[in-house]
Each structure stands twice: as structure tokens, then as C-alpha cells.
Swiss-Prot record:
Tissue: Expressed by the venom gland.
Glycosylated residues, chain numbering: N148
Origin species: Tropidechis carinatus (Australian rough-scaled snake)
Protein name as annotated: Venom nerve growth factor 5
Positions of the UniProt region annotated as Disordered: 47-67
Length: 243
């Protein structure tokens, strides 16, 4: 009797051991796991493909500013445009490095040894420093590099597109403009500093000058005279009650 019980127990254990395992308990690397992985990867790839096709059919709208900058960015130009010295302006700089933000913070110097533009004018500025000997300016001005100028008025009064980036000899150069403007139209309550307020009304205003800059004309780059801020001057008006 005991032998029969042992035989049945052994047969039961052998049956359990020989039963197929579920997919949840299949060890990693078995055929069942590989099938699941392949199925999951296929579904993921299909989802990514569908998402990519949807993005291509419905591209994200770009900002107007980005579209405008993209139209004048990284344009390939002919190196011959830079061979004539008459096209060079002391307030226009082409460089692959950002210039200093202000001459008040650090000296404005030539920023790229490979570029031969604007070297002499900046050297002359630094060889004649201005010392504080009690002199005061009639108007307070601030000079900064303008790095994102895309529109300007040309010498004919038309609004033109200014190139931001250019591709010259496989190097991307950015066009910078050194502009000067008034810090405050009334540095003192009476207007300009040092004027006779009893007989004159005065105020400070920014004036502009034409410089040659690289602009877009159709689909080609060309030099044009454009207006930029270059100085801060004092305007005086005689008071009418003195007549």
C-alpha cells in the first residue's frame, strides 16, 4: 500500500515538472521572450514611423521672426566682395566671434585674425585714450554692438533687408554694427549739460550716418548704404520770450 502511494506521488511530481511553463515565467533569451521583444519593437517602430509621417504632413508653424532670420542667414557670398577697400566701414564688422557688448566694459578690438576688415580704425581708437580731467560731455551717449539688425533704411529711403550671417570661404561670419545713441535726452533738468537755460531750450538727440553694409538684393548679396545711429548731439533753440 505504501509503495502504491509513493508511486502516485512520484508520478504527480513528474507530471508537474513536465508541464509547459507560462510566458510570464520564461527566462530571458528564450524563444517566447524573443517573440515578445520583436513584437514590442515592431509596434514601437510602427508608432514612431506614424508620428514622423504626421509631423512631416503637419510641420510645426515657425515664428515670423525665425522665418525672417532664416531668409538672410548663412548666405554664401563671393570673396571678391571684400577685396575693394571702398566698401569697408569702421562701424561694420564681420567676425566669427561675438564682439564685446560695450566699449565701456572692455576695449573694442579686432576679433578675428583671419579677417582684415576694420583693423586700423580700432587700433587708432585705443591709442588715444581719454582721461578724466574735469571735462564733461554736453550729452551722455552709449555705444553698443548691434548683433541682430535685419532691416534698415538705405540712402534712397527704402527699407532693405540686412544680412545677418554670411558664408565666406566655408566660414560663417556675422555682420555687426557699432552704434552710438543718446543715453538720456535730458542729462540735466534744463536739457543739455552746460547750456544757458535762461536764453536757450535744449535737448539731446541721436543722429544717424550712412555706412556700407551687406544687404540682400533679390537672391544676391550686395553692398548698400544704410542708416545707423552714430552720435548723440545737443539741439538748442532760442527762447521766444527774448525777442
Amino acid at each position: 500500500m505504501s509503495m502504491l502511494c509513493y508511486t502516485l506521488i512520484i508520478a504527480f511530481l513528474i507530471g508537474i515538472w513536465a508541464a509547459p511553463k507560462s510566458e510570464d515565467n520564461v527566462p530571458l533569451g528564450s524563444p517566447a521572450t524573443s517573440d515578445l521583444s520583436d513584437t514590442s519593437c515592431a509596434q514601437t517602430h510602427e508608432g514612431l514611423k506614424t508620428s514622423r509621417n504626421t509631423d512631416q504632413r503637419h510641420p510645426a508653424p515657425k515664428k515670423a521672426e525665425d522665418q525672417e532670420l532664416g531668409s538672410v542667414a548663412n548666405i554664401i557670398v563671393d570673396p571678391k566682395l571684400f577685396q575693394k577697400r571702398r566698401f569697408q566701414s569702421p562701424r561694420v564688422l564681420f567676425s566669427i566671434q561675438p564682439p564685446p557688448l560695450s566699449r565701456d566694459e572692455q576695449s573694442v578690438e579686432f576679433l578675428d585674425n583671419e579677417d582684415t576688415l576694420n583693423r586700423n580704425i580700432r587700433t587708432k581708437r585705443e591709442t588715444h585714450p581719454v582721461y578724466n580731467r574735469g571735462e564733461h560731455s554736453v550729452c551722455d551717449s552709449v555705444s553698443v554692438w548691434v548683433t541682430n539688425k535685419t532691416k534698415a533704411t538705405d540712402i534712397k529711403g527704402n527699407m532693405v533687408t540686412v544680412m545677418v550671417d554670411i558664408n565666406l570661404n566655408n566660414e560663417v561670419y556675422k555682420q555687426y554694427f557699432f552704434e552710438t545713441k543718446c543715453r538720456n535726452p535730458n542729462p540735466v533738468p534744463s536739457g543739455c549739460r552746460g547750456t544757458d537755460s535762461r536764453h536757450w531750450n535744449s535737448y539731446c538727440t541721436t543722429t544717424q550716418t550712412f555706412v556700407r553694409a551687406l544687404t540682400m538684393e533679390g537672391n544676391q548679396a550686395s553692398w548698400r548704404f544704410i542708416r545707423i545711429d552714430t552720435a548723440c548731439v545737443c539741439v538748442i533753440i532760442r527762447k521766444t520770450d527774448n525777442f
